[in-house]
Design a protein with these regions (language model features):
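Fungal secretory targeting signals
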Residues: 1-24
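Short coil/turn segments that connect the beta-strands within blades of beta-propeller domains
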Residues: 22-23, 69-71, 120-122, 178-180, ...
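Short loop/turn segments immediately following beta-strands, especially the blade-tip
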Residues: 37-45, 88-96, 137-148, 195-203, ...
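Blade-loop segments of beta-propeller domains
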Residues: 47-122
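A short beta-strand motif characteristic of beta-propeller blades
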Residues: 49-56, 98-104, 149, 157-163, ...
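Asp-box/WD-like beta-propeller blade repeats and closely related beta-sheet repeat scaffolds
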Residues: 96-172
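Loop/turn-rich, solvent-exposed surfaces of beta-rich toroidal or solenoidal domains
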Residues: 279-354
Length: 396
């Protein structure tokens, strides 16, 4: 095979045509487009290319949720004007996307996850940031699909960060390891909302929410289980956008009651002795093996257009996290990132740079390495604006 670095785009696409199982990624952009990317790796180098551009996902496609078993893809719409939609697509074996259904949504959706049904994939729940609500739909999505439920929240006054905590702002939804509970960090209310799932109907019943630190602004979360096949010792790690930190929570399952959380520690997304730069915001969090990763937006730690990602190690016995290092995310304003199934590559999506960067990861040490590929996708965004790349996921 020719060296990737010597390939022209035409040659690269030819190579990809012969590599049916080459890795791929899916990207959403606030310009109203979805993109299917190809990625091929040659040792310590790689190359990304756009295979398909599709106008879909509403006015502001904001998040991608993929069922890799069936190739079904759902896209939420953050726009609150016009006619916001929830879109379902089918992703072919070659990465080509095709819309299979759309349904009217409330708008303001910034994140979604599958839950319920017989296999944990019968419904989809979306966090609606500006509407202060969480809505859910039965799958599959068609033109006649109606929301199963819409839960709307209020609060009596502003939070400690008054400019951002003017009202409840649910920012994500995700299920616990048992699939029996749905959680939704609320940035505006400083809460982690917890719901019991009725699998057959998709109904969500509120449990007692967990209270975060004042002004933390919880955004996303990721679970960790110390031993496969057991929920004993389960931990939840929440990234706090306003606090620029990650909090560790123990997870308990009382007999006859709801899932409960207890916070054990909060650790900065920056090294000891370094304060979060003015205007920086922590974004997404993921767990891989015994490591936690959280991205920082607008910290410019590695240059005017290069932000950082924090790595933490997890203590097996306690679930406590220790800051390891901050490394280059090779993107500006990384709103989104995902680790591949093999655990050896990380895809970062820069909202403002509108670039996808592929970075190597050591599966033993957990440390992130050099960038091996980078691609501009769509048009660049403006600093502080929601007009660039919104999400990137591996298609695997």
């Amino acid at each position: 095979m020719a060296s990737i670095r010597s390939c022209t785009p035409a040659i690269l696409l030819g190579l990809l045509a012969t590599l049916g199982d080459a890795a791929g990624l899916l990207v959403s952009h606030y310009n109203g487009n979805l993109y299917s990317l190809s990625f091929i790796q040659d040792g310590n180098t790689g190359q990304l290319a756009v295979k398909q551009t599709l106008k879909a996902g509403g006015g502001m496609p904001s998040w991608l949720t993929l069922d890799s078993d069936t190739g079904s893809l759902w896209v939420t719409d953050e726009s609150t004007y016009g006619s916001p939609v929830l879109t379902q697509l089918q992703v072919g074996s070659d990465g080509t996307m095709k819309v299979t259904g759309t349904s009217k949504s409330n708008g303001g959706e910034v994140h979604s996850s599958l839950y319920g049904g017989s296999n944990g994939k019968g419904f989809i729940a979306a966090a609606e940031y500006d509407p202060s609500s969480i809505s859910s739909w039965k799958l599959p999505i068609t033109g006649n699909t109606q929301a199963v439920q819409k839960l709307t929240y209020t609060m009596s006054g502003r939070g400690p960060v008054a400019s951002r905590q003017d009202k409840p702002h649910p920012h994500s939804t995700f299920t616990d390891p048992t699939g029996k509970y749905l959680l939704a960090p609320d940035l505006g209310a400083d809460l982690i909302r917890i719901f019991a799932i009725e699998a057959s109907s998709g109904k969500l019943t509120a449990c007692t929410a967990a209270k975060t630190g004042g002004g933390d602004g919880p955004r996303h979360g990721a679970f960790w289980i110390p031993r496969a096949g057991s929920i004993d010792g389960t931990m939840l790690y929440i990234v706090n956008e306003l606090g620029n930190s990650v909090s560790a929570w123990t997870v308990s399952y009382p007999s006859g009651g709801c899932l409960t959380l207890a916070k054990t520690q909060t650790v900065s997304t920056y090294p000891t002795g370094k304060s979060a730069p003015n205007g920086s915001k922590a974004a997404e969090v993921h767990v891989a093996g015994n490591f936690v990763y959280a991205v920082n937006r607008n910290d410019k730690s590695f240059g005017s257009t290069s932000d950082s990602v924090a790595t933490y190690s997890i203590t097996l016995e306690t679930g406590a996290i220790t800051f390891v290092e901050a490394t280059n995310a090779y993107t500006y304003y990384p709103r989104t990132f995902q680790i591949n199934k093999a655990g050896d590559l990380v895809a970062f999506g820069g909202q403002t740079s509108s670039t996808v960067a592929i970075v190597q990861r050591n599966t033993t040490t957990g440390r992130l390495g050099p960038q091996i590929a980078n691609l501009l996708v769509g048009t660049r965004g403006g600093a502080g604006n929601e007009d660039g790349l919104s999400a990137v996921i591996w298609n695997e």
